[in-house]
């Protein structure tokens, strides 16, 4: 992050001290039971972002934020002033501050965001939907392609998003794939092919992978795609209309008809998918917020060329956080990744120390981004609209919670794991196999603390006898394959120990996701984290009982698959045996379930079964003896 240095532990920066032009980012450290929050730390520094009770970061903040919480740096031995509403928690929970010096407020803001994401400190505002939503990426190549990704990288590509709703992303991606002939099937970076694909034959690709695309014509398509993704549709429609008229003037009627169809598809999409405002309003974002007790909803609307392109909504559940802290956390997390940025952002109420955020937005956008709180006029009415919708979303959330009667263990689970909100959706993962073969990845889903069996899933794995590789493959495919559009869980539970948990963490990292993750080892019923921390709870603990139920459901989901396979295999074998008709097949399936158990059954036992004869039993044993071992 460009940090210039780290001050020694326990040192007290003198009043007004510091390197000129630098900003310090502080990290509160957790205290052992009974210790008070002091300047300087009694415990060892944590070796990693794990939740080590001897040195866990409990809060991260830039210099301005810490000044607001503690007023002035205290003298040696003085207690730090707690944040509003957190005095008792801080008195129980901290031993000191670490400082990292950065070059300016913008670097401090970036570092603060990264520290919060890495450590998820207890006293910072953590957004409920703090996950990597998908972006559309226009690659940085001579012949770019459009990809769906979950991580923004500094690679020169153009990113558009985030898209909180997978349906909206699919619709815009499908529209672009259908109307604009960007390459689609030649990989990233582009690989040369011998023959063009079917998209070229359908007129949906210019086939640069076989050298058929004219670079200038391809860049023209790229420019049009950028216009769609940035919401500049009106200008694009005018340009296409001029091209249509020019094609008709040259008597190129087929080309003119193609452009006409393209224009009609764009008009239909943007008239039904978006609400139109005044086109003179241009590009801007506006926000609304509503709150009831600990629960708050923040919503951001993106307006481009006078149309609402999308809405992003976040739920925060934190009793002690102020409205200003919640809004600041939303702005920080959203604008560190969102792209492209508008020239104007309308805020529902003033915030202190917005200069650093404005400077960060300026650097990201390459131009000034104004942060404004309008008091009257059309823009003030936009804020009223946003607040009204945020209030409706909050009321809906409260009614849903009341109606569904959340499981009491969810609050215990939130407190136990330090989650930002009650984990509504849980997913449990299990690896099972049939006699060392046919490994299966099983998914169980709980919502509100109760099984949602219609969303249980299973998948056959390619990994061999390596349980860790199997877990990594299963988790990666859950978030990148055919199941990627399912809702993201608030917590993952792995059936296994630290090895399986770390394999799952690697898969999440490869998929560009950051999700809370724990494992539950069999037998000892011990919770484990990717960092190797073990948490032993009494069997009567409600959170542990809920996780055991989830783990067992995932395991049973896998067993049901293997039982079904055994029955299918047995049915296949029985079909070809003389004297074994439908009734006898059904009897044997119900009694033995699988081929292995049937092979081990004695001849006399088979002959005594209702409806079986000695001759039929002998024919059955002879046929089973010829069957290859399972």
UniProtKB/Swiss-Prot annotation:
GO BP terms, alphabetized: nucleotide-excision repair; SOS response
Keyword tRNA processing recorded: no
Keyword check for DNA damage: yes
GIY-YIG domain mapped to chain residues: 52-125
SUPFAM superfamilies: C-terminal UvrC-binding domain of UvrB, GIY-YIG endonuclease, RuvA domain 2-like
Composition bias, Low complexity: 9-28
Domain UVR: 234-269
Region (Disordered): 1-96
Protein name: UvrABC system protein C
Family: Belongs to the UvrC family.
Keywords: Cytoplasm, DNA damage, DNA excision, DNA repair, Excision nuclease, SOS response
InterPro entries per the UniProt record, alphabetical: GIY-YIG_endonuc, GIY-YIG_endonuc_sf, Hlx-hairpin-Hlx_DNA-bd_motif, RuvA_2-like, UVR_dom, UVR_dom_sf, UvrABC_protein_C, UvrC
Localization (cell): Cytoplasm
Pfam family, one: UvrC_RNaseH
Subunit structure: Interacts with UvrB in an incision complex.
Highest taxon of the lineage: Bacteria
